[in-house]
Each structure stands twice: as C-alpha cells, then as structure tokens.
Amino acid sequence: MRILLTNDDGIHAEGLAVLERIARKLSDDVWVVAPETDQSGLAHSLTLSEPLRLRQIDDRHFALRGTPTDCVIMGVRHVLPGAPDLILSGVNSGANIADDVTYSGTVAGAMEGTLLGVRSIALSQEYEYEGDRRIVPWETAETHAPDLIKKLMEAGWPEGVLLNLNFPNCGADEVKGTRVTAQGKLSHDARLDERRDGRGFPYFWLHFGRGKAPVADDSDIAAIRSDCISVTPLHLDLTAHKVRAELSAALGVVELGG
C-alpha cells in the first residue's frame, strides 16, 4: 500500500514525525510532501499567484512552499511514482472538531485527496496547557491510529467522503473507546486586537476562540471530552438538501432530483 503524508503544521512538525511512524506500521511505501512553513488555518486554499517551490530532503521526503492542498496535488501529480492508495494528513497539534474543520489545513489535505479520488484521513491530537507550555500526548494517536486505520481501510467508505479522526487529551491507556460521530457545533468568538506600530500606524492581531454552546451527545466534541477517539465521516457535497424543497416552494420552481 502506497501512502502519502502531509500536514499543515509544516515539514519540521513533531506531529508529522508521529504520522510517519503510524504510516510505517501500515506500509513500507511511505512518502512525505509537507509545507515548508506552518500553514495552520489556511483551510482548503491553494497557491495561484506564486510559483510552487519544491525542496527534496531525501528520496521520499519533500518540502513545498505552499499549502496542504498544494502539497497533496504535488505529491499525487508529480512526486510519487504512482497514485497513492491512502493519504494521511496530520497529526495536527490540537483537535479539529466542530466548525473548526472549515478552517483546518489538516482536514483540507484530506479533502484534496478525496477530490483526487484517493481515500484520505485527517488525524488530530487534542492537548492542554501547563502554564505557557503546550502538552501534547502524541503517544495516544501513535498507539491507537495504526489499528484504527487498518479497520477503517478494511471497512471502506464511499467516494466523496473523507474521515476526520480526533484523539482525546489523555494517555494512550486512558482512552475509553472509539465513537463514530457527527460534526459538532461551537459558539463562534473571533476578536480583533488593534495595536500601533513604531510609526503610529494601526495593525491587528486576530484572536480566535470558542464560547460555550450546547454539546450533542453524538458529536465529535462530546467524544473527545469523554476521552474517546472520534471518527467523523465528512462529505464534500455541501448542499443543504433538506432546505431545497422549502426554497423551491418559496420560489415557485420545480425541485429536480428530489
């Protein structure tokens, strides 16, 4: 099985090294094409106004000055000697759950792989802070991901669907199970902090946070809060199908394919 790895935290990220160890428990044919620099929060963006510069580190490790989407395209269309059987994106430092999946470059790597017709999985590891220090229990994802991915590959999933895996903030031996979940909902809280530079001109820092909101029992949020691994199937079709009939009636048009 040929596996392509990417991420959004960059080629030097610890999570990418964890992902490679996970992948090597599944196959010896593992390739890495990851961003040269941190691309967190760039979602499914791709580079159109600048050239893509590819740096070969060794036979199967490449760094690209581009986004996770760029990396997947580069890997599939140029770097690999043939199409991959699986694309793994991650392991992200921090969970990618609920609405955050729309911002996530990690999830976007799996989205692009799915668009290219390759089975794709995004992996993220929740963490906590001790003072100013981020504590990421990488061993949780590294321990549980290989067997979970094997089972998922054996089960299979439809075209146009990617899998979003999130590992809880607990030790590997403290995980209480795996849940197949729905994408949750968090309260949106984005703020701008205006400051002044040395010449008095304004600039801004974006503070991105989440407020409290009701949590559904079947959601990805509830799963990782319960120290369970969350497996969320996401599909690329963004159509709000339940609303189509209502809009068709309101506009007096015939709903096709309903």
UniProtKB/Swiss-Prot annotation:
Q: What is its main location?
A: cytoplasm
Localized where? Cytoplasm
| Annotated GO MF terms | 3'-nucleotidase activity; 5'-nucleotidase activity; exopolyphosphatase activity; metal ion binding; nucleotide binding
Q: Does the keyword Nucleotide-binding apply?
A: yes
Checking HAMAP family in the record gives: SurE
* Protein name as annotated: 5'-nucleotidase SurE
The record's Pfam families line, in alphabetical order, gives: SurE
Per its record, the protein catalyses: a ribonucleoside 5'-phosphate + H2O = a ribonucleoside + phosphate
- Biological function: Nucleotidase that shows phosphatase activity on nucleoside 5'-monophosphates.
Tell me which family the UniProt entry assigns to this protein: Belongs to the SurE nucleotidase family.
Q: Organism source for this protein? A: Brucella anthropi (strain ATCC 49188 / DSM 6882 / CCUG 24695 / JCM 21032 / LMG 3331 / NBRC 15819 / NCTC 12168 / Alc 37)
For activity, the cofactor(s) needed are: a divalent metal cation
- Lineage of the organism: Bacteria, Pseudomonadati, Pseudomonadota, Alphaproteobacteria, Hyphomicrobiales
GO CC entries = cytoplasm
EC number(s)? 3.1.3.5
- Quote the record's cofactor note: Binds 1 divalent metal cation per subunit.
